[in-house]
Amino acid sequence: MFSNTSSSGTLDASGLHLPYCSGVYCYGNLFRTNTALTIAPKELPATTLTKQCYQGMFYNCTNLVTGPEVIAATTVDDQSFRIMFSGCSNLPSTPRFEIKALEGEDNCYNMFYNCTSLTDINCTLPATTLTEMCYRGMFNGCT
């Protein structure tokens, strides 16, 4: 929908409401490689995520400077956050997480890969149920 977009202007998606979606890959790649995106939706309110729900959602949005404040999910399925912010080289902070159970594999794989401007890590990673490799490479390439 908003992927692979570039323009001389900027895109502020802070007012965009993304409701619960029960399908696989619901919001996957929604803004992928959108270089106009500077402000993400303020909140991602879904509490139960389906497989690959937010995978690659902001992948390579190199001008993103304001990510979501909160990811409200408490239960997530396979690869829900895989490469979600990967390549967002101007993103200064992470969202706050409310995750209690990571019920699939590779949930946060390379989630913030190469986010070289990260200085504020807001996620406390409160999950009490973990699966194999759930946080694998989450902050790879961050300096």
Regions found by a protein language model. Give the residues of each.
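Negatively charged
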Residues: M1-T143
